[in-house]
Amino acid sequence: AASDVYKRQGTLSSDGTRLENLRVLFQAPGVDGNGHFGSRVVEAPDGHLFLTTGDRQKFDPAQDMARVEGKVLRLNRDGSVPSDNPFVAEEGARPEIWSLGHRNIQGAAIDASGQLWVNEHGAKGGDEVNRVERGKNYGWPVISYGVHYDGSSIGEGTKRQGMEQPVLFWDPSMAPSGYAIHTGEMFSDWEGDHFIGSLKFDYIARLDPQNGFAEERLKSPETARVRAIEVAPDGSVSYTHLTLPTKRIV
């Protein structure tokens, strides 16, 4: 059966127990299938919303400008389309599109400069970190550092003119999930570092952008299957596990 992807907005109740006045900001068309939903939402410093969509395991939509699947979308807070989006004036293109050629974005974060970063699942290998720029094409499924699960090649290889390269890729894949960028006094040596959870190898990756995105793997029995990561204003780092309560790195 077809399944839809919704982005909703609501208000937290005064007692902090529920969301009220829910309304739909964006709804993607229903697609048959059960995977590659994407569905991360982050707010830029200027108030615009970035929404991620997966390719819904259909390959072609990620490069189809008339489709919203496999894209990063940019909306105003009320769900309307900003007039300065890159493809607003392009005939046949969905005006919400900010970037294209994505497979399945599972994490998104904004750094101190307002730059959007995402991580996304490859197929067998080829999980990526991408610095998302206005109007850019990130290649899926034309280029990839992964292969199909049967070992066959994907698309044309790893590079093509006019398509962006990832800042970092993992092979074997690590199944990236939650994404946060560090600020705050606690763990001040980590200022500006990127934190990404792994659903596959049970660790949190700390990436240092000042050192070529060198990776340190923070691992314990309690970091298994990390889904979400948050950095508080004081710099403390918390994460959620799929089956355990929220944990904090101390």
Where are these regions (language model features)?
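Short, small-residue-biased leader/transition segments that mark boundaries at the very start
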Residues: A2-Y6, H241-T246, V250
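Asp-box/WD-like beta-propeller blade repeats and closely related beta-sheet repeat scaffolds
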Residues: K7-V42
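Beta-propeller domain segments
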Residues: F50, D55-E216, A224
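Hydrophobic, well-ordered secondary-structure segments
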Residues: L19-R23, G35-G38, D46-T52, M65-E69
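Generic C-terminus detector
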Residues: R225, V231-L242
